[in-house]
Amino acid sequence: MTSSVDSRMADALLDDFLAFTLTGSAPSATDGACAAGAVRWQWLGDGLLALEPAAAEAADTARASVLVSAGVHGDETAPIELLSMLVRDLASGALPLACRLLVVLGNVPAMRAGERYLDDDLNRLFSGRHAQVPDSREAPRATQLEAAAAAFFAAAPAGAARWHIDMHTAIRASVFEQFALLPHTGMPPTRTMFEWLGDAQIAAVLLHTAKGNTYSHFTAEHCGALACTLELGKVRPFGQNDLTRFAPADRAVRKLVSGATGEADVPLPRVFTVIDQITKQSDALELFVAADVANFTAFARGTVLAQDGDYRYTVTHDEERIVFPNPSVKPGLRAGLLVIDTTRETVAALV
């Protein structure tokens, strides 16, 4: 029999998943029902919550499995707040749940500290790369998040849709305020994903051309998920976000988990494909762009963008755009991506 203490802790967990997680509490009962019995929930650990419809239906075999994550960088607060509100509305019954759902708050210790990360960028430690930094405080969390995603998708109905939406905000401004990054899988992007991104009013999509170590790369490659990383605006402290700026993406996530149909004939995002990157060779790296240059700023052929000892990066296409320029990364890491517009050919090849 559930005690009143268990019930109060469950209410606190579900009513404000963010606040509950920041306290470091663990619920005395780790599973239960909510939404007037319509939803089952299970607490899987710090910042990890699974929810699914309680009623067994014939449609269960086609029920989608959706992982929605935020806070992989601990200071990217707006998506974390949106995800906590999503849990609240599902638990209260204000929003129906039509899928298996795994909610993930990523780097919880960094969230508590108000930092991007403590030792290492968590979003570069997936697909086993955490084994290279065993002393990092982020390494155990990467291991835990990989295991949680793998177990969640392993239990998915065969043939049913699998999604992973990883929500972030960016350090710097962007020519396209809200954009998405799709992991490289060796297959053309899907029209299903592009139409969902269009419904979310995502202005641009960046296509990776090599495997990476991000959370969405992991779930796409190892779990077979339709996965994307969303960049939804600027980093701000908890409580200082204008969440109305995130409304289209929030609505699209809510449609996905509630089984609602997206808007028809939405404009598809522009598409940019990675053609090179600036890799920091040493602490002597010079990036010849303004410190506050916006993501997707364009540069003409012949422009020298970086120099590091004998290494120099010069624009070789008529126009290249820089994304995520960051000269302060550790040597050996990416200090910027270079992309070109490939909208026409990408949209023509959608599957």
UniProtKB/Swiss-Prot annotation:
InterPro entries: AspA/AstE_fam, AstE_AspA_cat, Aste_AspA_hybrid_dom, SuccinylGlu_desuccinylase
Annotated EC: 3.5.1.96
Keyword Ligase: no
Any one GO biological process: arginine catabolic process to succinate
Pathway(s) of this molecule: Amino-acid degradation; L-arginine degradation via AST pathway; L-glutamate and succinate from L-arginine: step 5/5
Cofactor names: Zn(2+)
Catalysis: reaction(s): N-succinyl-L-glutamate + H2O = L-glutamate + succinate
Active site (record annotation): 231
Residues binding Zn(2+): 73, 76, 168
Nucleotide-binding among keywords: no
The name this protein goes by in its record: Succinylglutamate desuccinylase
